[in-house]
Amino acid sequence: MKKQLFILSQYLLPHHLLSRLAGCIAECRVRWFKNAFTAWFAKRYQVDMSQALVEDLTAYEHFNAFFTRALKDGARPLDQTPGAVLSPADGAVSQLGPIEHGRVFQAKGHSFSVLELLGGDAALSAPFMGGDFATVYLSPKDYHRVHMPLAGTLREMVYIPGRIFSVNQTTAENVPELFARNERVACIFDTERGPMAVVLVGAMIVASIETVWAGLVTPPKRELKTFRYDEAARAPIHLEKGAELGRFKLGSTAIVLFGPDQVKWAEELVAGSPVQMGQGIAAPKA
């Protein structure tokens, strides 16, 4: 019964209003409040601050600064194996495997469309049909910056509006096409392994998604918006392997897509496997 009530609440709650309220709280600079809230959060979720560039919880100007904290140099060494594909984030593998019939596996009995995930653009989604995907879930305690799995040149970014369902095992198993319904930002890169998509998926109380080249992505009007970066008028944006791509102000999920016959996921990785940014999660297939 508790599970059914939780799922029902996901459909009834005012997602965007709650996220705006969470954003206001997370940006609050009232010293006693932000210190107390940050300390409670760190204790509640057992956040390891020993690897943070700034270990003192009270030194952050607001909760979001703590949540998107930088790590010390060397805290996340990059796998130096030639051709290695890196985990884009700290977290746990939600699912990974082949893209079959244009769909990505979500949980038992559920999948979602690559076409819908990328905003309904057939030309954008076509290179990934028959390819491979990995979904990484970032829990509240994790480092919340997202990094490049491979070096790449940005070709396109798409903001796709949507709901903001909570993202966890329960919703993955009970909300159809969860990741293709939530608000998200899809980033398409040209890499040594062909096109690569990194999709940052929002969730309830995720106040915003940022990228290093555009800052806050959420447009004033919540409508689908495409930003092209392969035009002559724009300077190319190239990011090296392991470079920061973006960040969640409060957490969620990163999904990585590759085209057919490009990568082979590490055999030891299964649903639930913990991963760290910079860890090798795949090798070139050919």
Swiss-Prot record:
Enzyme Commission number: 4.1.1.65
Task: Write out the GO biological process terms.
Answer: phosphatidylethanolamine biosynthetic process
Localization (cell): Cell membrane
What membrane topology is annotated for this entry?
Answer: Peripheral membrane protein
Q: In which pathway does it act?
A: Phospholipid metabolism; phosphatidylethanolamine biosynthesis; phosphatidylethanolamine from CDP-diacylglycerol: step 2/2
The free-text function statement in the UniProt record for this protein reads: Catalyzes the formation of phosphatidylethanolamine (PtdEtn) from phosphatidylserine (PtdSer).
Descriptive protein name: Phosphatidylserine decarboxylase proenzyme
Q: What is the lineage of its organism?
A: Bacteria, Pseudomonadati, Pseudomonadota, Gammaproteobacteria, Pseudomonadales
State which gene encodes it: psd
